[in-house]
Regions:
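A short, N-terminal "cap"/entry segment at the start of jelly-roll beta-barrel domains
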Residues: 1-27, 111-123
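Short beta-strand His + acidic residue motifs that chelate non-heme Fe in jelly-roll/DSBH
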Residues: 41-43, 61-62, 78, 84-90
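Short, charged/polar surface micro-motifs in flexible loops or helix N-caps
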Residues: 26-28, 37-39, 58-60, 67, ...
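Ligand-binding loop in jelly-roll beta-barrel domains
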Residues: 80-106
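Short histidine-centered beta-strand/loop micro-motifs
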Residues: 20-23, 33, 41-46, 87-89, ...
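Short, conserved beta-strand element in jelly-roll/cupin
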Residues: 34-36, 45-61, 99
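Short acidic-glycine-tyrosine-enriched beta hairpin
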Residues: 66-80
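A generic "binding-loop/recognition-motif" signal
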Residues: 28, 37, 47, 66, ...
Length: 123
């Protein structure tokens, strides 16, 4: 697979889909997300590690019941097996990119809405 070199912050800011996979290789995956105001990602736990970088908006991170605030430039690392959720608390969508290691979503995954993502859940 060729190297990936793009402005990830611009890609995340421009993304309007709830979830959009943009890169998957053998050991990692990059996914863009846009969470509408008042909505959340949905409580979940993965079998893989997850790193989230917040690009714009404001929100709340909930990891194993512990709550903290997130905003542009926040980084949250979610170890495999950690129960987590992220809530968009501002007036604009919470925009972020996330890195899974190893990959979590199928290559080419696009979920335009949270409902679409929930219908496709595999965990």
């Amino acid at each position: 697979m060729p190297a990936f070199n793009q402005d990830i912050f611009a890609l995340a800011e421009e993304n309007t889909f709830f979830r959009k996979e943009i890169l998957t290789n053998e050991h990692s995956q990059v996914v863009l997300m846009s969470v509408e105001p008042g909505d959340d990602i949905g409580e979940e736990a993965h079998d893989v590690d997850q790193l989230l970088v917040f690009v714009s908006g404001t929100g709340e991170a909930i990891l194993n019941g512990e709550r903290s605030q997130v905003k542009a430039h926040s980084l949250v690392v979610v170890p495999a097996g950690t129960l987590h959720n992220f809530v968009s608390t501002g007036a604009t969508p919470l925009k972020l990119f996330t890195v899974y290691s190893p990959p979590e979503e199928a290559p080419g995954t696009i979920h335009k809405t949270k409902a679409e993502a929930a219908a496709a859940e595999h965990h």
